[in-house]
Amino acid sequence: MAKDVRLGLDAREKMVEGINVLADAVKVTLGPKGRNVVLEKSFGAPTVTKDGVSVAREIELEDKFMNMGAQMVKEVSSQTNDVAGDGTTTATVLAQSIVREGMKSVAAGMNPMDLNRGIHKAVEAVVKEIQKMSVPCTTTESIAQVGTISANSDSAVGKMIAEAMEKVSTEGVITVEEGSSLHDELVVVEGMEFDRGYLSPYFVTNQEKMVAELDNPYILLHDKKISNIRDLLPTLEAVSKAGRPLLIIAEDVDGEALATLVINNMRGIVKATAIKAPGFGERRKAMLQDMAVLTGGTVISEEVGLTLENVTLDMLGETKSAVVGKDSTKLIDGAGAKADIEARCAQIRSQAENTTSEYDSEKLQERLAKLAGGVAVIKLGAATEVEMKEKKDRVDDALHATRAAVQEGIVAGGGVALVRARSKVKVKGDNDEQQLGIEIALRAMEEPMRQIAANCGLEGSVIVNKVMESKDNMGFDAASETYVDMIKAGIIDPAKVTRSALQNAASVAGLVLTTGAAIADLPSKDGASADAAAGGMGGMGGMM
């Protein structure tokens, strides 16, 4: 396919046009007085949002070179959202400012490579200052404040997230779901829950709820398929003598083995329930091992020389209770030793920190939460589907931001941290062009505060100058349009969010400034001729 090649300034100017289109649409959402953006949907009602990354993701431009620029800045907001969960609009505003000022210098004949080095030197120095300024976020009150800010000043959401973190610890899993009422509610699930249900409805003990409830059960953990009942007989006899129920968690249970378990259950000989082990492959083995640690049992695996015929009661795990539904199973209050559980948590935490795969990291965090704290579910209520979607976006953002705050601490919000950090930076470039790059980056750090003020209908320069004349955490509270101590007023940002926004913005802005050529596909001529043919057909139809 033929390509359209643009070189130098021609390529960069088109990309910058695209960047400005995307950034101008996103930045209207910044701050407590930011505006909503309405997104058209192919089906159903449009979505109304104040979430920067949701706006950015919707933007696709017709001009391919403009679209390249827009997609690069979209990457800034997506990357910031993935790493820190918030700060997407801030990152976009920073990237636009660095590109805009940098392009003026490149057009004036400056070396873009040196400008880029200067920008990165400034960002590195400011990031160090932000890390020095950060205050640990450990209290329920400060966690609630972070959640409130990230949920666009919705204090109820902030409080609910703080309460969820308090109940399941900062390690626990907190999920956000659409509820069925008009009110938000927090549901805390104790113990370990996973998405596997009973293999036969004949295992159900509570017909009303359609669940199998097992009190003080033994738990048999096996990493292979169980088809032959003879393999299970020694275990069933031992459990029957003990007079306790049995929960079998294996790769699968079918055929003769499943039929015998069902018959024994119906006749009341042994109260047993069988489920498939969660996960697949290596992850299944790891999750079975987690269950073994939690319940104080042993995974019966041929890899370690254990077979079903040799199982004794002390190899079985135990819990206070187990509830098995159609699609999920919950193990409550396992009999595993606390020291063993803590050691297993430390091992999983270490794996999560060292993995490069985002998917693996997410799954490891889930496993950690199930072992360490439990699961909290925030069920959202809203009057309409449009409101529900918008609220879910906000709560997801707030949840990510509070996690980021717990990890790296908090700094003054409202763009104050960037302005304070830039005033402390004394970095020098190796030459005039690097120095100019440093100045471009430092000037861009005022931009989020200017935009917050602009969204209030105020002059950004006046606000920035007034904040720079004051000290410490004094800043501009856009909600009340007053100057306050930002940390005391609870207007705070996670340090990780501010840091990620700045680093990602500088990274993409540097790429745009150092672009020497851009290549895109030319429009297909076949498409044009096909359109012409279609037009001709229509004309003929009119003649008949």
From Swiss-Prot:
Its main location: cytoplasm. It comes from the Bacteria. GO terms for cellular component: cytoplasm. It catalyses: ATP + H2O + a folded polypeptide = ADP + phosphate + an unfolded polypeptide. CDD domains: GroEL. SUPFAM superfamilies: GroEL apical domain-like, GroEL equatorial domain-like, GroEL-intermediate domain like. Belongs to the chaperonin (HSP60) family. Forms a cylinder of 14 subunits composed of two heptameric rings stacked back-to-back. Interacts with the co-chaperonin GroES. This is Chaperonin GroEL. The lineage of its organism: Bacteria, Pseudomonadati, Pseudomonadota, Gammaproteobacteria, Thiotrichales.
